[in-house]
Curated annotation (Swiss-Prot):
Cellular component GO terms, alphabetical: cytoplasm
Gene3D superfamilies: Phosphoenolpyruvate-binding domains (3.20.20.60)
Residues annotated to bind Mg(2+): D45, D84, E115
Pathway the protein contributes to: Cofactor biosynthesis; coenzyme A biosynthesis
Function: Catalyzes the reversible reaction in which hydroxymethyl group from 5,10-methylenetetrahydrofolate is transferred onto alpha-ketoisovalerate to form ketopantoate.
Record-given protein name: 3-methyl-2-oxobutanoate hydroxymethyltransferase
Species: Saccharolobus solfataricus (strain ATCC 35092 / DSM 1617 / JCM 11322 / P2) (Sulfolobus solfataricus)
Superkingdom to which the source organism belongs: Archaea
Amino acid sequence: MKKVTIRDFIKKKSMKEKITMLTAYDYPTAKIISNTTLDSILVGDSLGMVVLGYTNTLNVTMRDMISHTRAVARANPPQLIVSDMPFLSYEIDVKSAVKNAGLLVKAGSDAVKLEGGEEIKDIIRAIVKAGIPVMGHIGLTPQRFLRLGGFRTIGKTKQEEEQLIKDSLELEDAGVFSIVIENTYVDIAKRITEKLNVPTICIGAGPYCDGQVLVIHDLLGLSEVTPYFAKSYVNLKEIISSAINQYIIDVKTNKFPEKQHYKERES
C-alpha cells in the first residue's frame, strides 16, 4: 500500500469512496494498522481518556501528543497520520499555534486537527500557510465541553444548526483538507457534506459523510463505556481477562513455564 496523502482524501470524495480512520496511540497498534488498508490514523487527544485515565481531554499536553505521535510514526505506516492539537496549544495566539503544529509534524505527523469553528479560521489559515495540512473538527468538540454544557448532541436548535453550516464553510475557506463532524444529527451532517468540496469524516453523525472515524478502544471492546455511536467488533477486554486468569492458574499449578520456555545446562 502506497502512502496516503491529503490529495487521496479529496480524490476519494470525488469518487464517492468512503474514507476510513481509526485512532492509534502507540507503536504496536500502529504496526498492526500498517498492514491493513485503513486510510488514516488519528493520534487523538482522546488518549487522555482511553490511555491516561483522565475524565476528559483537557489535561492532555503537547508533550503527550508529541510522544504518542512519535510512537505511531516509528511504525512507518502508509496511512495518513493526523495528530490532534491539544487544549490551549493553538487558542492563545497564532504564533504559538503554528509552532506547536510544526512540532507535531516534526514528531512524524502528516497533518494536524483543530477543534472549533469560525473563531479559529485565522489560526487555521496561518498553519496552512506555513505548509502544514489541517483537518477541522466541528459539532461536539470535546475540548469545549465545559462551554457546551457537557458531552451532548449539537444542532438541536436552528441557531446551532446554522452555526454548524457556517463553521464548515468558514473552515473550508480557511484551507482545511477535511472536517470531522462529531455527534450531530444525521440530516445536518448530510447537508454539510453536500455543501463542501472537502471530505467530511463522521463520528456519531450518520452514514452520509465521506468517511468514518472511531476510537480503536471502542472498536476492540476495550473501553469502560462504549458511546452509543461506536461499534465494538470484538470483546478484547474479555479475551485479555481470560488470558490473564489462565496465566495465574498455570503459574500456581506449575503448568507455566514449560520446558520450551527455559534452558537447562547440558550434563
